[in-house]
Amino acid sequence: MTNPKLVLAYSGGLDTSVAIKWLQERGYDVIACCLDLGEGKDLDFVKEKALKVGAIKSYVIDVKEEFADEYALIALQAHALYEGKYPLVSALSRPLIAKKLVEIAELEGAVAVAHGCTGKGNDQVRFEVSIKALNPNLEVIAPVREWSWSREEEIEYAKKHGIPIPVDLDSPFSIDQNLWGRSNECGILEDPWAAPPEEAYELTAALENTPDVPEIIEIGFEQGVPKTLNGKPYSLASLILELNAIAGKHGVGRIDHVENRLVGIKSREVYECPGAMTLIKAHKELEDLTLVKEVAHFKPIIEQKLAEVIYNGLWFSPIKDALVAFLKETQKNVTGVVRVKLFKGHAIIEGRKSEFSLYDEKLATYTADDQFDHQAAVGFISLYGLPTKVYSIVNNQKKVNV
C-alpha cells in the first residue's frame, strides 16, 4: 500500500526542511512546492535541497507575473496600507501560495497540504483559510505549530537526520521577501525603542549613503496599470523590480511599524517597499487628477476595508470580490503620466498629466483667461448654506423663548 501524498509549502529553510522528514515519519510522501515571487532566491538550489532531504518530487514555479498582475496590482490600485503604513507584502503572497498548493495537491492526488508557520503569526490563518476556501476536503497540517520544539531541539533533529543546516541560521532576523517588498522581524527589532541596525535592510540605502543629486522618473499608467518607466514599456513585475532598484538606491520605502496582528498581539516589523511606495504615491496623484469628487472621497473607505480584508487572510471571500469590483470600476480613466523626483528617502510628485484630466486650467486660473462664472456662486452659496441658516434661526428662537 502506497503512502498518502502531501504537498508542502517549501522555502529551503530549516523549519520546512525538518518538516519534510517529520511528515515522512508520519506516513506521508512529501511533495515540495516553492514559488518564485521575485525575492531573488537561488531556487534551483532550493529545488534540489528538497529532494536531498527526502521529498519525492520538488516543484519550483515562477509566479512573478501572476503575483504582480493579480495580487500586487489590486493592492496598488487600492493604495492598500494596513493601519496606514504596511503595504501587505507577505499578506499578498499567501493566497497565491495557497492556490498553488491546492492546484498541485489536486494534480498529484494528494490528501493534505502543509505549511511552516508557527502558532503565533498571521500567516497560519491566511494559509489555512485560503486553502479551505479553495478545497475544503484537503487536510491542512502545520508541523512547526504541532511539534513545539525549541530551536536547539530542532537543530539536533536536523543533525540526527542529516538535514543541512542553513549557513544564515545564526541571523537574528526573520525575513520574508517578494517583488512587492521585504519584511523583517525578530532579534533587536522586538524592542520597539531600539533603532533598526543597518544590517536589517537590504533593498534600501541609508539616507547618508544615498546620492546627493535627485533622480527624476516618469511612470506611465493605462487604466490604473503601470505600463512604462521613463517611456520604456515593462511588464508589471519587471517594472516593480526595476523601481525597487531605482527608488531603493535613494532610500525610498523604509517603514518601521508596530502593528496589530490578527492573532491579537502587537508586533514590531521593519519593511522595505521602494517600488510599492513609489507606485502607490504616483497612482494616487493620477487619481486626484481623473476621479470625480464623490468617487475620490468614497474610495478611501473601500481602500481601508480591502487592506484589512487582505491582511486578515480573506482573499478568497465574497467581501474581497465585492470591494475589488468597486475598485476596478474606478480605474477606467486612470490613464496618464506622473513625474516623480527621488531624493533622500522621498518620492516627490512634480507633475501629472492625463487625457482624462478633470482639471480645467481656464476654470482654475485667476488670470484674464478665467472662464469661471463668479456670479453663479451667489445662488450656490445661498442654497448650500440654507440648512445651516434654518437650523440657526430655529435654535436661536428657542434660546430667546427660554
Swiss-Prot record:
Q: Origin organism of this chain?
A: Geobacillus sp. (strain WCH70)
Say if the entry is tagged with keyword Cytoplasm.
yes
Give the matching Gene3D superfamilies.
Answer: Argininosuccinate synthetase, chain A, domain 2, HUPs, Single helix bin
EC main class here is ligase
Which positions does UniProt annotate for L-citrulline binding? 86, 122, 126, 174, 183, 259, 271
Q: Which UniProt keywords apply?
A: Amino-acid biosynthesis, Arginine biosynthesis, ATP-binding, Cytoplasm, Ligase, Nucleotide-binding
User: What single Pfam family name could you report for this chain, choosing any that match?
Assistant: Arginosuc_synth
Q: What is this protein called?
A: Argininosuccinate synthase
Q: Which CDD domains match?
A: ASS (cd01999)
Q: Give the matching PANTHER family.
A: ARGININOSUCCINATE SYNTHASE
Family per record: Belongs to the argininosuccinate synthase family. Type 1 subfamily.
**Keyword Disulfide bond annotated:** no
* Quaternary organization: Homotetramer.
What is the reaction catalyzed?
A: L-citrulline + L-aspartate + ATP = 2-(N(omega)-L-arginino)succinate + AMP + diphosphate + H(+)
InterPro entries the record matches: Arginosuc_syn_C, Arginosuc_syn_N, Arginosuc_synth, Arginosuc_synth_CS, Arginosuc_synth_type_1_subfam, AS_cat/multimer_dom_body, Rossmann-like_a/b/a_fold
The protein's location, in the record's own words, is: Cytoplasm
Q: What is its main location?
A: cytoplasm
Q: In which pathway does it act?
A: Amino-acid biosynthesis; L-arginine biosynthesis; L-arginine from L-ornithine and carbamoyl phosphate: step 2/3
Q: Where does this protein hold L-aspartate?
A: 118, 122-123
**Superkingdom, according to UniProt?**
Bacteria
Please tell me one Gene Ontology term that the record gives under cellular component: cytoplasm
A single Gene Ontology MF term assigned here is: ATP binding
Gene Ontology biological process terms, A to Z: argininosuccinate metabolic process; L-arginine biosynthetic process; urea cycle
* Enzyme Commission no: 6.3.4.5
Gene name, per UniProt, is: argG
Q: Where does ATP bind?
A: 9-17, 116
Q: Which residues cross the membrane?
A: none
